[in-house]
UniProtKB/Swiss-Prot annotation:
Signal peptide: none annotated. The lineage of its organism: Eukaryota, Metazoa, Chordata, Craniata, Vertebrata. This is RNA-binding motif protein, Y chromosome. Its main location: nucleus. The RBMY1 proteins are encoded by repeated regions of the Y chromosome. The exact number of functional copies is unclear and may vary between individuals, and some of them may represent pseudogenes. Overexpression of Rbmy proteins in mice carrying the Y(d1) deletion that removes most of the multi-copy Rbmy gene cluster does not have any effect and fails to reduce the frequency of abnormal sperm. These results raize the question of the role of Rbmy proteins in sperm development.
């Protein structure tokens, strides 16, 4: 629609760049008094841009000029004359001028034309007026590549870098998001993987040697009334323990009785220091308690117990009968006999050595510590 505040304003396009403003005023002044003539020029080069705006004082004069001058050749070019209308894309501040496409006039107008670079602005998009009809519509020629430009991109080519940075940042964010999305999957796999047994179960399955402390078998029989364990569960490798028990079996005269209940697992570590005090009186707790002193020592059957693992045939039978005393020290160590007898008993159960040694060594004895054999056995 025509401008409401200036109804007599007309648009003249397709002018030759050599046509002057004074020439336009003389030619169009024949239709009526002219109020104002504006020839659009480039701000840097000061050259004509090929179109102008002319304002008549009366609306009727403007309409006559449009009918008469539209399509007339002026300075070698056919001009286009029509009623000036305000373009919808223009701001309200620029009422008297069509959009300017000069490089220095403003980046916003160049951006609205869809051009992004400063080098492109020098050539400038051609804004030719479409004279077919009663409205002026600029024609913007797009480059042959058919590229679509962003509307609000800064004309400076230096500003083209931030989109690439943002794209790299977004790609990194997507990669990080992908990594975070795969973490629960790894945790799920780790939860489904078979786990090894706890260290405690492996320790219980393979107990330590008895020289170093109480094993799982000792803990197994701690809850019994006397704290004794089954001697038959121990292997023949514990030869020193089997010899000690075979010696004690001699005091009992080889009675066919299971002597596996005499000592707990702790007694294997605490054995030999009170070995010579077996003649002492029984404790107040009962007949079996005379062996309690036997489990209070801290020697174990590592090196300090060797003096007590000697020839069984000479420990009690000959020494007690010959001396008649109640306190006899053990004889010196016979290592050859210990090694030889250990080799003989290897491969047999400790219970076999227990009874064989008792029958061989003390079958002829009738008294122990001055007490008849039968009465002494009843005390146990």
């Amino acid at each position: 629609m025509a401008e409401t505040n200036q109804p007599g304003k007309i648009f003249i396009g397709g002018l030759n760049i050599k046509t002057r403003q004074k020439t336009l005023q003389e030619i169009f002044g024949r239709f009526g008094p002219v109020a104002r003539v504006i020839l659009m020029r480039d701000r840097e080069t000061k050259k004509s841009r090929g179109f102008a705006f002319l304002t008549f004082r009366r609306l009727a004069d403007a309409k006559n000029a449009v009918k008469e001058m539209n399509g007339v050749i002026l300075d070698g070019k056919r001009i286009k004359v029509k009623q000036a209308r305000r373009p919808s894309s223009l701001e309200s501040g620029s009422k008297k001028r069509p959009p300017s496409f000069s490089r220095t006039r403003g980046a916003s107008r160049i951006l609205k034309c869809g051009r992004g670079g400063r080098s492109r602005a020098r050539s400038g998009p051609s804004c030719e007026g479409n004279l077919g009809g009663d409205r002026y519509t600029p024609n913007f020629n797009v480059s042959s590549s058919g590229r679509h430009f962003a509307v609000k991109r800064n004309p400076s080519s230096k500003r083209d870098d931030p989109p690439s940075k943002r794209s790299a940042t977004s790609a990194q964010t997507r990669s990080n998001t992908g990594l975070r999305g795969r973490e629960p999957h790894r945790r799920e796999i780790s939860r489904n993987m078979p786990r090894g047994e706890p260290a405690s179960s492996r320790r219980d399955e393979y107990p330590l040697p008895r020289d170093y402390g109480q094993s799982s078998n000792d803990r197994k029989y701690e809850s019994t009334s006397r704290g004794y364990c089954d001697y038959g569960n121990y292997h023949s490798r514990e030869e020193s323990a089997s010899k000690v028990f075979s010696d004690h079996a001699g005091y009992l005269g080889g009675r066919d009785r299971d002597f596996s209940e005499y000592l707990s697992g702790n007694s294997y570590r605490d054995t030999y220091r009170s070995y010579g005090r077996f003649h002492e009186a029984p404790s107040a707790r009962g007949g079996n308690n005379r062996y309690d002193d036997y489990s209070n020592s801290q020697d174990g059957y590592g090196g300090r117990g060797e003096p007590y693992i000697s020839n069984r045939s000479n420990i009690y039978s000959s020494d007690y009968e010959r001396s008649g005393r109640q306190e006899v020290l053990p004889p010196p160590i016979d290592r050859e006999y210990f090694d030889r007898e250990g080799r003989q008993e290897r491969g047999h159960s400790p219970k076999d050595g227990l009874y064989s040694a008792s029958r061989e060594s003390y079958s002829s004895n009738t008294k122990i510590w001055g007490i008849p054999w039968r009465s002494w056995r009843k005390q146990i």
